[in-house]
């Protein structure tokens, strides 16, 4: 629907606009019979992280019935790509494709979880922006024929298929701002790869938040025990070893010859965190960096509601044991980013933003009922001393984001160094904490952290940690 900025991209269920929170999904194994055994786990991982949509990416497969039935039963919406990714289609096979489309649509159209069908992944972008005509020597008549075939398939055959148009939404290409129009932030959907492939900082997620962001992400390494399952001698490894290089498939020669995902992981770690000294620290910091990126993106998109109405990161799962953009590794272990997304996707969250020399405190309520409560904001030193505090009774309205406090930054610091304080935020209702968060005023590497003395106690199946000062991003692991 058109508005004063362009055209929105909303999903409306039972007459209510729903903010979409989810991820891109790829087959969880190369072998389909093994992949089907993982459906329950992947969908549970999505539910446990407060997701309401998975995008079945066009470079994978049309999944088995069990996958769609599980999504139906668990309330997970599906963005269903047709299986065309980063490619153009040769002429002369339209009839065969029509048969394939009818088979696919007739098999899947009964599933209420399918919320949208999409013609292809990044084919429009590749043709108009990535220089495919030059790369594949398509000029003159060849170029016209290739483009006409694209138009026939994605803007005529599929667009006017009664099976889709009468019952479902159809979108010709992801990303795009409309039929044959490249993506922009004013209409349609976006793939935000300025972060990662463009080496932009994480505030790009806020600066370029469009109507619906259906891809974004950065890589991280899986935990050490996962790597040991495909190479037991990992303790003697570095990122340059051929075994790890083999599993790194993100290549970026336009930045520099030989530049790959490991270089980019190192690039982003060094922007936000201290330089790692060994492979174990690289693994840990890569996951913390990915978590920071996805949390920043998800909160930025949610704060931009209702202009932005959806966020789908790349990607929830892995197809093999590898180094990738996933938040859950091949063996089902959550990375730090999946825990971060679980928090950022909660129905009600409290978060902050520095803008125009003020600290803005948001409460975002995606529920279809209002909630009354109290927000409590404390400015603290790193060892827990409260410097200032603010408290306000609020009503978080149905399906909205609201700014409840707008605090001048000058009044917050008052001769305190930005790197030695943080803001502790909580929203309470009926004396129960609904959500909590922390806002730092500097990059993690610039926080004046002290050496922490941490005491761990175990009570039945609960581990409690106590520290004499702020201990940031604690990671617990077990060999069991």
Identify what each model region corresponds to.
Residues 1-116, 252-288, 465:
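Active-site-adjacent substrate/metal-binding segments within catalytic domains
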Residues 1-54, 303-304, 308, 333, ...:
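Secreted/periplasmic carbohydrate-active enzymes, especially glycoside hydrolases
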Residues 25-27, 58, 121, 174, ...:
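Residues that line or immediately flank small-molecule/substrate-binding pockets and catalytic motifs
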Residues 27-30, 61-64, 86-88, 123-127, ...:
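Flexible loop/turn segments at secondary-structure boundaries
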Residues 42-45, 67, 97-100, 104, ...:
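A general structural detector for well-ordered alpha-helical segments in enzyme core domains, enriched
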Residues 64, 97, 110, 151, ...:
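Active-site-proximal structural scaffolding
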Residues 73, 90-181, 289:
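Active-site neighborhood of glycoside hydrolase catalytic domains
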Residues 117, 124, 160-187, 191-371:
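Substrate-binding clefts and catalytic carboxylate motifs of secreted carbohydrate-active enzymes
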């Amino acid at each position: 629907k058109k508005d004063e900025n362009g055209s929105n991209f909303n999903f409306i269920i039972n007459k209510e606009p729903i903010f979409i929170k989810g991820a891109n999904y790829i087959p969880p194994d190369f072998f389909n019979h093994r992949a089907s055994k993982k459906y329950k786990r992947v969908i549970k991982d999505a539910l446990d992280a407060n997701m309401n949509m998975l995008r079945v990416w066009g470079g994978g497969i049309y999944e088995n019935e069990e996958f769609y039935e599980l999504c139906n039963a668990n309330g997970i919406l599906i963005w269903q790509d047709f299986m065309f990714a980063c490619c153009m289609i040769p002429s002369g096979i339209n009839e065969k494709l029509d048969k394939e489309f009818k088979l696919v649509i007739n098999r899947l159209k009964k599933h209420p979880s399918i919320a949208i069908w999409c013609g292809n992944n990044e084919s429009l972008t590749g043709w108009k922006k990535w220089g495919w005509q030059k790369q594949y020597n398509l000029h003159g008549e060849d170029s016209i024929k290739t483009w006409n075939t694209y138009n026939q398939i994605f803007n005529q055959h599929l667009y006017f298929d009664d099976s889709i148009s009468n019952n479902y939404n159809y979108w010709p290409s992801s990303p795009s701002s409309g039929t044959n129009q490249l993506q922009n932030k004013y209409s349609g959907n976006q793939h935000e790869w300025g972060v990662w492939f463009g080496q932009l900082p994480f505030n790009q997620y806020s600066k370029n938040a469009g109507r619906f962001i259906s891809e974004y992400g950065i890589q991280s390494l899986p935990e050490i025990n996962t790597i040991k399952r495909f190479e037991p001698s990992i303790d003697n490894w570095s990122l340059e070893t051929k075994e790890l290089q083999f599993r790194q498939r993100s290549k970026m020669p336009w930045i520099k010859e030989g530049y790959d995902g490991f270089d980019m992981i190192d690039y982003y770690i060094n922007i936000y965190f201290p330089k790692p000294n060994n492979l174990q620290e690289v693994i840990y910091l890569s996951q913390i960096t990915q978590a920071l990126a996805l949390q920043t993106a998800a909160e930025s998109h949610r704060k931009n509601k209702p202009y932005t109405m959806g966020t789908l990161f790349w990607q929830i799962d892995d197809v093999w044991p590898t180094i990738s953009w996933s938040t859950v590794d091949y063996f089902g272990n959550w990375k730090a980013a999946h825990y971060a997304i679980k928090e950022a996707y909660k129905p009600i969250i409290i978060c902050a933003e520095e803008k125009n020399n003020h600290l803005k405190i948001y409460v975002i309520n995606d529920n279809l009922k209002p909630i009354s409560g109290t927000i409590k904001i404390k400015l603290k030193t790193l060892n827990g001393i409260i410097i200032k505090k603010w408290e306000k009774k609020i009503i978080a309205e149905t399906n909205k984001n609201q700014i409840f406090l707008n605090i001048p930054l000058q009044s917050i610091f008052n001769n305190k160094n930005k790197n030695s304080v943080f803001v502790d935020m909580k929203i309470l209702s009926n004396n129960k904490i609904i959500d909590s968060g922390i806002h730092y005023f500097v990059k993690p590497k610039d926080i004046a952290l002290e050496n922490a003395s941490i005491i761990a106690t175990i009570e039945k199946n609960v581990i409690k940690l106590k520290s004499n000062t702020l201990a940031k991003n604690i990671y617990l692991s077990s060999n069991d």
